[in-house]
Amino acid sequence: MADAPFWHAKALAELSLAEWESLCDGCGKCCLHKLEDEDTGEILYTRVACRLLDIAACRCTAYQDRFRLVPDCMDLRQVPDQFHWLPASCAYRLLSEGRPLPAWHPLVSGAADSVHRAGKSVCRLAVSETVVDCIEDHVIEGLGDAV
């Protein structure tokens, strides 16, 4: 019998850095600005992306320096109790909740672009924060809800 994939065999805290990084599907949703409803605590996604996000590629243009350049960029390895703000489709959130990766995830599909082909990335909807005046005008209902 073949060995189970690492994400089945290990807890998130046990993953190597390479394994951790490979869990990212490249959707770009974590790089979108989010707002929190003060009354309900609901996380509202916007289509406004961090200035470092290459929207077409859904990749950070300064990944190694992102925490220095964007002080509120979160190191997910350091805040596992904060996964609730990640989209429901995020591998880190799914695995922390004991749920499987979706069929379109690159580790499951074997294709790096499967997240884009499945329409799960922000490459066709995001706009850079550098061209937006009012983030509140760009809230997108339900963006973080669907797997």
Swiss-Prot record:
InterPro entries (alphabetical): Puta_zinc/iron-chelating_dom (IPR005358), UCP006173 (IPR008228)
Pfam families: CxxCxxCC
Sequence similarity: Belongs to the UPF0260 family.
Name of the protein in question: UPF0260 protein MCA0521
Originating organism: Methylococcus capsulatus (strain ATCC 33009 / NCIMB 11132 / Bath)
